[in-house]
């Protein structure tokens, strides 16, 4: 059984090892991904892009040169963690694009992640990363907001011990002017 299928020449489907999570990555005018859990859409097609200092945008009109997949099922020793070993099990989809870059998606049983990969030999700076999260419903979220600093400005939110109380609210009720962190 394949974990990656070509769809309409621009869409690629990747499933988690258990098959419960599925993401479809599409390379059209934009690079997009979606997410489904047990066949239920939890994220609609959402764009990804990186803007470089020379004006290049990885993710705008991407052209796939080559696509391949791999599966990993291994353990790593973890002498400083609460478990002696960490189990690493995922399926991956790598899309190599024209222009010297690629995007890799990994589907684990409990989540999907991505990363941009460069084969460009000259130095560059990333000016902006665009990542959308287009939810089909106004889901409820539990969010730990970063405490604002004494001056109340945006930068003061970066000085943080990552300890805080959590706010539970619909996505539409979250504060876009506040930083949050992952628990």
Task: Map each language-model feature to its residues.
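Bacterial Sec-dependent N-terminal signal peptides
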Residues: 1-10
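N-terminal accessory beta-strand-rich subdomains and adjacent acidic, glycine-rich linkers
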Residues: 11-183
């Amino acid at each position: 059984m394949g974990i990656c299928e070509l769809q309409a020449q621009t869409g690629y489907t990747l499933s988690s090892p258990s098959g419960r999570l599925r993401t479809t990555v599409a390379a059209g005018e934009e690079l997009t991904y979606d997410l489904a859990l047990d066949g239920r859409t939890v994220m609609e097609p959402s764009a990804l892009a990186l803007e470089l200092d020379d004006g290049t945008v990885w993710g705008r009109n991407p052209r796939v040169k080559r696509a391949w997949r791999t599966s990993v099922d291994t353990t790593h020793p973890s002498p400083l963690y609460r478990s002696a070993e960490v189990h690493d099990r995922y399926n991956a989809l790598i899309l190599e694009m024209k222009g010297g870059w690629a995007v890799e998606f990994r589907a684990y049983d409990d989540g999907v992640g991505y990363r941009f990969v460069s084969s460009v030999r000259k130095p560059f700076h990333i000016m902006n990363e665009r990542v959308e999260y287009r939810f089909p419903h106004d889901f409820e979220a539990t969010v730990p907001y970063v405490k604002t600093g004494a001056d109340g400005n945006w930068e003061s939110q970066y000085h943080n011990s990552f300890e805080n109380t959590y706010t539970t609210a619909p996505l539409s009720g979250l504060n876009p002017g506040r930083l949050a962190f992952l628990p």
